[in-house]
Amino acid sequence: MLTTEEMELLLPEMTLIAGIIFAILIPNLGDSTLRIPLTRTRIPIFIGGTRFKSTSDPRVPARIAIFALFVAFIYSFLEIEGASGEVGGVIEITSFTRMMSFVFYGALLLSAIATTYRMPARTSARAPRENDSESLTEALISALMDNRRQVDFHILLMMVGLGMGLMAMASNLFFMFVAIELAGLAAYVLVAFHKEEEVGGEAGAKYFIVGSVASATGIYGMSLVYLWSGDLDFDALATSWAAMDGLDPFAVIGVGLMLVAFGFKVSAAPFHLAAPDAYAGASSPVAGVLATASKAMGFVAIFRVLIQVTMPEEGEALWFILLAIIAVITMTWGNLAALTSDNPKRMLAYSSVAHAGYMLAAVAAVGSGLGDTSTTELVLVAIVFHLTILVLFKLGAFLVLAMLETEGRSHRLEDLHGLAQRDPLIAGSMFIFMLALAGVPPLSGFLSKLLMINGIVNISAGTGSTSADAIVPWAESVDPVFWLAMAIVLNSALSLFYYLRIGLVMFFEAPENEKPLRKSLHLRNTILVLTILTVFFGLGPGAEYLLDLVEGAVSDL
C-alpha cells in the first residue's frame, strides 16, 4: 500500500493510471439500472444502458488523455529541481528521472494534440444509407471507425507514457525491463493502429516481430546477469562488476544481449531495420513519439547499464571499441539511406538512425576512460540536452507531416512540393526543423551537436603528439576518440543534402494541390510554438536555462 508521500512522488504516473481508468469508464456511462433481488426496486449503476449524451461524445477520450498527459508533463517539469525519493525498493525518483519523464510526457502530449486532427472524432458521423454514393459511404464508415477507436488509441498512448515514466525511475533491472515492455507492447499496437491501410498492418507486423526478438534477447541477457550476480539492483550490479576478477562470461554475454534490446529502441544499426517501415506505416504523431520519446527511453537504459553499472572508475570500458564502431556505422548508414529516400517519413526515420549514431558516439567517448569527471558530465549533458530538444524539431517535423496526412498525403516527397505557396508559415517551420536537424546555427540542434563534439574533443585532448610536424603523423598519434567527433562533423555535413532538399521542393517546386492547407488551428499553433522554441533554446538565456536544468538532472544520474 502506497503512503501519501509515495503517491505524491508518483503523481504523474498516478495521473496517467487515473486517465486510463477514466478513459475506459466515462464513455460507457449510461442509464443502466439493477433490480434488487425479490423486489421491484431498481437502482442506477450507470454502466451500460443508453449512454449519456455528454459522456458518449467521441471527443471525450482525447480530452482525458490530453489532460492527464498535461498534468504529468507540468508536474514533471516542476519537480526536475529537487525531486528525491524511493518507492518499493525498485523505484527511485531523482532530478534525472523527472527530466526524462518531462521529455516523455511532452512528446506524448504533442502526439495526443496532433491526433485530434490526424484521427478526428466527428460528433456528426452517421451510418451510411442505401442512397449514399460510394465515396460518401466510405467517408462515413471511416468517420465511424475513427470514433470507435478513440478510446483504444488514447488508452494505448497513456500506457506508453506510464511505461516510459516507470522505466526512467527504475532502480532495478527487472523492473526496468517490465516498464520497457509495457511501453513497447502499447507502441506495437499504435504502429499498426491504422490496419485498414496496407502499410499500417505491414509496419506493425514487422515492428512487433523484430521488437519481440530484441526484447526476448534482452530478457535472456538479464537472466544471465542475474545468474552471475544474484541481484538485479543497479547499485548491487555496479558493485559486483567493480569487484569482478577478470571477465565473467555470464556477465559479459548478458550485458551484450541486453544492448541488442536497447539498440532496437534507439534504432542503432544493425538493429534499426524495422524502424523505417514502422515510421512510414504509423501515423505521423506516433512516428514522432518513436523518434523522440522511445529513443530517449532506450538511451536511459543504456545509461543505466553502461554508465551506471559497467563503467570502471579508471581505464577503458569493455564496450568502448564495439560501441564506437556501431556509432560510426549507425550515423553513416542512416545518412546514406536518407539521401536515397523519396518518402519524407522514411527519410526522417533514417535521420533518426543517424542521430542515434551521434549520441552513441558520445557514449562511446565516455567509455574510453580518458575523460575526468567534468568532461564525462559535459558529454552526458550534451546527450540529454539533445534528447530534450529533439522533441521540438524532430516531432515538429512529424506534426507538419500530420497536417498533410489529413489530406491523405505525406508518403511522397512530391506531397511537400510548393508547400510554401499553400502555407508559408508551416513551410517556414518545416524548413527551420530541417535546419535544426542538420545542426545549422543558431538553432538548438546546432548547440546540442556542438556540445557533443566539444565534449568528445575535450576527452581526447592531449592525446596527439605535440612534436608531429605534419598532419599524418599527428593523426596517427591522436586517440581514436577524436575521430568520433570528426565522424559527427562529416555526417552532419552529409545530412545537409537531404535536409536542404526538403526546403528546395517546398519553396521552388510547383504544388500538386494549390488549395491552402486545412486550418487545424491547435495543431498549427503547436507547430509554431515548437518553431519558436527551436530557435529560443539555441542561443541566449533560453539555452542557458535549459542547459542548467539538464546539468542539474545529469548530476543525479
Locate the predicted segments by residue:
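Alpha-helical transmembrane segments of multi-pass membrane proteins predominantly involved
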Residues: 1-557
